[in-house]
């Protein structure tokens, strides 16, 4: 069997076939990365049968270069592509947080006013604000309100001493308020209805999307009713005239009234009809003119 000539430590050569030891570069692509295989012959090895091969596998990134970690200090704030999205914490709306000195009081009697409620709570500290919620139209008490003390300790003392106490037949419920101020009133029951709107209003197609009254329809309907309304003579509205028209009372004297078409205006000019009975055995009654005068007179 032919043997290869020995190679010195400084000599290296390439073998085009992968079966023979040599230096070849094979590239294999996968879905994740690219592997480059480099095969080199060991210069110090003279064994022709074994042909020891040293393989160095270098794993590279898909882009061919390792990623460089980005530090927050290395970010350019003027560059929008590299600037980090920093969200500042949003502060709560002013007046919405309760520090502990604002109280919510319910069970307030309808006859109790703000000054009286302040006098009750001022025994335990300085009351800086008091408000009883009321109806917007009638101004009647809704039975609850809010108070504020100058310190949290004073508010806590008021809760411990006034909670479940009875005033004017109602029991107070005193506790820390969830908010330092009440919610803004909403349209409707607590803010008051729009008195200009009534049942005849309907939505219109105007730009503001509000409600308006159809003045044209009301004006035309009133004009139609007035044009076809019959005119009646004015009459006196007195109790006597009303009775005459209501019951059709004849104001003439009774003797001048007609009865079935016959007038009895002067009864002395009319003779009473004879009431005769033609039945045999009965004599006719004498008429008014046949009665003889009394001779004794």
Curated annotation (Swiss-Prot):
GO biological process: mRNA cis splicing, via spliceosome
GO MF term (any one): RNA binding
Modified residue annotations for Phosphoserine: 184
Compositional bias annotation for Basic residues: 254-263
A Gene Ontology cellular-component term: nucleus
Region of interest (Disordered), ranges: 1-20, 39-100, 174-297
InterPro entries found in the cross-reference section: Nucleotide-bd_a/b_plait_sf, RBD_domain_sf, RRM_dom
Protein name: Uncharacterized RNA-binding protein C25G10.01
Compositionally biased tracts (Basic and acidic residues): 209-223, 233-253
Chain ranges passing through the membrane: none
Keyword Zinc: no
Biased composition annotated in UniProt, kind: Polar residues: 287-297
Domain RRM: 101-179
Assigned keywords, A-Z: Nucleus, Phosphoprotein, RNA-binding
Cellular location(s): Nucleus
């Amino acid at each position: 069997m032919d043997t290869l000539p020995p190679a010195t430590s400084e000599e290296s050569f390439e073998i085009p076939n992968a079966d023979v030891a040599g230096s070849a570069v094979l590239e294999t692509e996968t879905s994740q990365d690219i592997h480059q295989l480099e095969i080199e012959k060991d210069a110090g090895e003279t064994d022709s049968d074994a042909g020891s091969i040293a393989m160095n596998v270098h794993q590279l990134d898909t882009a061919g270069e390792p990623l460089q970690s980005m530090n927050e200090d290395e970010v350019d704030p003027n560059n929008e592509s590299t600037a980090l999205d920093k969200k500042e914490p949003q502060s709560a709306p002013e007046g919405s947080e309760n520090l502990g000195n604002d109280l919510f009081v319910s069970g307030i009697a309808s006859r109790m006013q703000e000054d009286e409620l302040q006098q009750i709570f001022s025994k335990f500290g300085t009351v800086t604000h008091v408000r009883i919620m009321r109806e917007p139209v009638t101004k009647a008490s809704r039975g609850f309100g809010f108070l504020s003390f100058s310190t949290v300790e004073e508010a806590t003392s008021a809760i411990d001493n006034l909670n479940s106490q009875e005033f004017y037949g109602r029991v107070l419920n005193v506790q820390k308020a969830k908010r330092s101020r009440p919610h803004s009133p909403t349209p409707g029951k607590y803010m008051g209805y729009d008195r200009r709107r009534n049942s005849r209003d309907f939505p219109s197609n105007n730009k503001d999307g509000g409600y308006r009254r159809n003045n044209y329809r009301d004006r035309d309907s009133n004009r139609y009713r007035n044009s076809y309304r019959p005119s009646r003579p004015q009459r006196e509205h007195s109790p006597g005239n009303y009775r005459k028209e209501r019951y059709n009372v004849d104001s003439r004297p009774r003797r001048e009234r007609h009865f079935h078409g016959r007038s009895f205006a002067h009864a002395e000019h009319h003779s009473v009809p004879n009431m005769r009975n033609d039945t045999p055995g009965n004599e006719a009654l004498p008429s008014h003119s046949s009665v003889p005068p009394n001779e004794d007179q």
